[in-house]
Amino acid sequence: RKFLSLVGVMACATVRAQEKKVDGGLAVIEQKKIPRRTTPITPPGSLAVRNMEAHCTGCQLCVAVCPNQVLRPSGKLMSLMVPEMSYERGYCRPECTKCSEVCPTGAIRPITKEDKSSVQIGHAVWIAANCVVNTDGVECGNCARHCPTGAVQMVHKEPGNPDSPRIPVVNEARCIGCGACENLCPSRPFSAIYVEGHQNHRTV
């Protein structure tokens, strides 16, 4: 009897776990995986990866106040517990400066919303093999629609052929690395477009 009860409990737990992965009971949701970035992404106001690592004490105040769950502590040995950015759960909204307001050490310096809009912490990179245009044969354009700076544009896959599907092209000079494109890309498990960080932040 105890065995049957245990089996019943385990079965219920399995069902509940599966329900959490289903969107409204219609489709299974596959969680996004973190892309392999050559350079980590650090928040606007941190100036550079080296500055962030040199001044951060790992207090996690910035992680705690980030409303979009973009910041998380690094698990790398050389930068252990130093927050870095990733866009599986959200993206860095241009109007948010919360992390720069709470940093007590200067790892992330105070920055205004106006200044933040011109700071390039990284740039978007499109991976053709992951894009639904190529994997599923459907048009999307989610990345272009949600880019706050207009850095992502849709162009015909075959130049001169108006009937060919459209694919994204990134204007690196306008991209600020906010991650809206990466976060809202429907491709799974890896986004078809992701942000590569900059060692030193730039101005656009």
Where are these regions (language model features)?
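Non-ligating segments of multi-cofactor redox enzymes
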Residues: 1-204
